[in-house]
Amino acid sequence: MSSITRDSQPALRAGVRLQHDRTRDQWVLLAPERVVELDEIALVVAQRYDGTRSLAQIAQELAAEFDADAADIEADVIELTATLQQKRLLRL
């Protein structure tokens, strides 16, 4: 497994997609034989996993959008990314 840094450029793995589950009224990551529910914060991060933006860039965008501390946002983004990578939902 690749190590995650602020320069990592994650994207959803093949076969994983972001979708709104109408039954649950919840955004989820759908993967073969599993569903991962996303809270509002995880959703705005996951929407930016495009394989071109670094985690530092994603954190800067979110810090500007939500008027929050960039260092705190970056730490949270890296933590979420690590969790999703451990679940094999992302490629770096």
Swiss-Prot record:
GO function term, MF aspect, one: quinone binding
Pathway: Cofactor biosynthesis; pyrroloquinoline quinone biosynthesis
Keyword DNA repair attributed: no
Keywords: PQQ biosynthesis
GO terms for biological process, alphabetical: pyrroloquinoline quinone biosynthetic process
Keyword Nucleotide-binding set for record: no
Known partners and oligomeric status: Monomer. Interacts with PqqE.
Family membership: Belongs to the PqqD family.
Database matches in NCBIfam families: PQQ_PqqD
Role summary: Functions as a PqqA binding protein and presents PqqA to PqqE, in the pyrroloquinoline quinone (PQQ) biosynthetic pathway.
Protein name as it appears in the record: PqqA binding protein
Gene coding for it: pqqD
